[in-house]
Amino acid sequence: MDRISSLPDEILEHILSFLSTKEAALTSSLSTRWKNVFVFVPSLHLDYARQHENPREFIDFVDFVNTLFNRKGNSPIKKLALKIHLKDNQSLQNQTHVQSWIHRVLSRGGVTDLDLFITFKGKFQLVPLLIFKSNTLVKLRLGRGFTIKLCHENVYLPMLKTLCLDTVDFDGDHNVFETLLPRCPLLEELVLEDQRWKQWCGSVSSPSLKRLRIRFFHIPIISLDVPGLVYLELSCIFGSKYANVNLDSLVEARLNHWVEEQELRKLRDGSSHLVPADMMDLITGIRKVKVLHLTSDALELFYFSGQELPMFDNLVYLSIASDKKQGWQILPLLIKNSPNLETLVFKGLEHYTTKQCGDACVCSGILGKSSSCLSSSRVKVLEIWSYQGTSKELKQMGHFLMKLQFLELVKIRAVSNLQVPIDIQYLLKLPRASSNCKIQAIF
């Protein structure tokens, strides 16, 4: 007997848990010793996500899963990961199988991780009522492209800590979180990806939530009453109104807003019907963060909010994505209002040229005549991503080095597809206001 086969069942089951259930089942042909080991692996990874054309293949898959459940008997299942693609002409029958498998896993108890990824050929499909009652479930992921019927009495997840909803809808509930969140009292992480809740009012309220990630195309009104939240990632198109923003414990925020080019032009010439000031409640709500990441659109939306920025007294790390179509107008005030900023990251240096950049950049040609945001900043670390070594970028780097008096380290990350190597010597020879400043180039 080989050494692996002599290992205890518990260890063999743990090894097989890293394989898909289909792959683990293949080990049953190795010897009598291996015949039933895979059956008792506490995690199931069932994958039928490919768009098979042969109906017989799905029948074989269903038979395999049903046989597996029968052979497992009452042995515990800690995790179920199910990826499956359903065709329109067989969807109702196939949904019944899926619903049965989920019920069998939840009803036996002990499951801590449930990951369902169901896709359909064609339009959104209605999945029959799913009963989510479990005293042990810790992680639940649902996706993508289907509608769930959800009733108040069919949801009770007292141990759930992570909930991920990826492109799913809920039938007949204008505010699904009034049903879900109160029945998940320990929930710490909520992920909402590309939701299609046409009737959702955009409200999230939870005293236990620590991490929240939302990615929607558009939500008219967003309410965030999550006083214990420490991480927020928000991605949506400009136009949402923010109300009741309670983020007193927030440590890190990623604002990935985007603005259509035509709408951005209207904002600049004052003809937009949208109200940029509606973002001010969000900006004020995140004022206590230590780490802030902004897309180029989000940075410009800060400027068009039309009101004085709050003080970001706790901010130590600021990351800004730059694009030639978006400006740095708000950057001088943002840096000025961040007195404890230590690390400043630019994901690219190219940006839309305006006269409002102050001495943050060299593009306007009015250096020294506007706010001295860089000269008064105590930034110690400056990072530049996607550096191409152009003459304009080199000039901008020289400006940073001469204005930031407390710099200790400059990290330069070159763009990956450079055709001509960057001569680092030009950077190293630039004069610096700080005698302790070192330059580190990563190519």
Curated annotation (Swiss-Prot):
Report the Pfam families cross-referenced here: F-box, LRR_At5g56370
Q: Which CDD domains match?
A: F-box_AtFBL13-like
Residue ranges occupied by any F-box domain in the UniProt entry: 1-47
Q: For this UniProt record, give its keywords in alphabetical order, as a comma-separated list.
A: Leucine-rich repeat, Repeat
Q: Where are the LRR repeats?
A: 139-167, 169-194, 201-236, 271-296, 323-348, 363-389
Protein name per UniProt: F-box/LRR-repeat protein At2g42720
Q: What lineage, starting at the top, does this entry show? A: Eukaryota, Viridiplantae, Streptophyta, Embryophyta, Tracheophyta
Which residues constitute the signal peptide according to the record? none
The UniProt record lists the keyword Lyase: no
SS bond partners: none
Give the PROSITE patterns listed for this entry: FBOX
